[in-house]
């Protein structure tokens, strides 16, 4: 299983949100390029970078910074505001390894399919963020500011027909809380769609959580707030 450090960007700085709330932001003193270089030196195989300003505004705002981060030698999957073919091509042509498409996949499937066809499915990660208030996980959009009526399973089934294999799934209630992932959700995901390379995000606290996700068949785990804790040895997590 791939262990992927996450870096959230806001106004050029590293931040973390609690449960996706923009009014609950923690800003860190380390600069994004330094953080990327740190993970590259430790042996990370990929970075997950989110432009929070882009996610909120609908257009990626920090592409130049993200490209500078990738120059540290670590491939990046990046998202936050990729909501047009032009923006997707700009990111791809700038050298971003994989584009993370979120809200657009729910609000504009036709445009999303055009992007998939242009960029190729293997270069796309669909980021599907859910609220599990009922038995059915429903998707949130626009930086988690709004809820949709689409279920996770409906959307995955739809895009599977267009060659999508990489899906990043976050239970919003777990994100930034350090209370553990939603294991039941990921177990269901793998059971329903075993051919999808699932990336789990939200709530991971320690090595045991990672081990459990691996045992469920999850392909990758995204680590955010956990990596800002003083007692975490990232090199050990890679083993």
From Swiss-Prot:
GO BP annotations listed: L-histidine biosynthetic process; L-tryptophan biosynthetic process
Residues of the active site: 8, 129
Cellular compartments per GO CC: cytoplasm
First-tier enzyme category under EC: isomerase
Domain of life: Bacteria
Family: Belongs to the HisA/HisF family.
Protein name: 1-(5-phosphoribosyl)-5-[(5-phosphoribosylamino)methylideneamino] imidazole-4-carboxamide isomerase
Organism expressing this protein natively: Legionella pneumophila (strain Paris)
